[in-house]
Regions:
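Alpha-helical transmembrane segments and their immediate juxtamembrane cytosolic regions
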Residues: 1-262
Length: 262
């Protein structure tokens, strides 16, 4: 619970624990604001942003201290404003979001271009809570522009693929995909490993068995071809979906059996 990393196959579930705490904190904080008659989205946003920035600054100033319970704490602090961004958009900004697409994309690209020009490296890693090389404000600005970009892209795609069964299948199983994506990748690696052993190396003879057994981050690409990464994407999507479908059926059967007895 503290690390959020559990078994290596479930490394993708690291976000569950801080998000769980964020939900609890959010409910309690909003109840407190109602008691003092200050239940306002702007206040919540400002407070959560301040908390998130303190969390990032803690990681910047004390990188060696980010482990154990401290890691869970700063992850939770970082998530608070991210969680509020969604609520704030829904409650305040969505009805005012009427800017035409040209102006919308122009602003996003202008902000991103400015960040890319004047900042060292925009990449940061919230799972390990590292690589905050541009202070405690830039990570949130870059995140907001990225979210705004994909929000606009999704609006373009909805008329074309909004009712697609495949898209809905993926959209309805995003939690399972996030949690079990590494299981999907490992399944594909097991296929490569199995074929290599069965054919005595005639197929995928350069598969590194030692790396496969020792590191979950070993990804075998036949002949080093990056195009094989697409197959990892397929396994990373549909193996978790299959797991989710099976688990849902088991839960449904168990739930029905229990209530029949009652």
């Amino acid at each position: 619970f503290v690390d959020g990393e559990a078994f290596q196959y479930n490394l993708g579930s690291w976000f569950v624990y801080p998000l769980f705490l964020v939900c609890i904190i959010n409910v309690l904080f909003r109840k407190f604001l109602k008691l003092i008659h200050l239940d306002n989205e702007f206040i919540v946003l400002i407070v959560y942003l301040a908390i998130g920035m303190i969390g990032i600054n803690t990681a910047i100033e004390n990188p060696t201290a980010i482990n154990g319970i401290v890691k869970l704490l700063v992850r939770t602090m970082f998530f608070l404003p991210c969680y509020e961004f969604g609520r704030f958009y829904k409650a305040v900004l969505e009805k005012k979001d009427t800017l035409n697409n040209v102006a919308y994309f122009a602003i996003i690209f202008a902000v991103q271009l400015t960040l890319l020009t004047f900042c060292k490296d925009l990449e940061y890693t919230p799972s390990s809570f590292t690589k905050f090389n541009n202070g405690f404000i830039i990570p949130y600005i870059s995140s907001i522009t990225a979210i705004a970009f994909w929000l606009s892209v999704s609006r373009f795609l909805v008329p074309a693929i909004g009712n697609s069964k495949l898209v809905r299948l993926i959209a309805d199983n995003t939690y399972g995909i996030m949690v079990n994506q590494l299981v999907g990748f490992m399944c594909l690696k097991f296929v490569f490993y199995g074929l290599s052993r069965i054919t005595s190396g005639a197929l995928f003879g350069d598969f590194n068995v030692a790396s496969f057994k020792s590191s979950i981050w070993y990804y075998y690409l036949p002949n080093g071809l990056q195009q094989w990464a697409f197959l990892y994407l397929i396994f990373g999507l549909f193996v978790p979906i299959l797991i989710s479908i099976i688990l849902n059926k088991i839960c449904h059967i168990a739930h029905s059996s229990i209530f029949k007895k009652v």
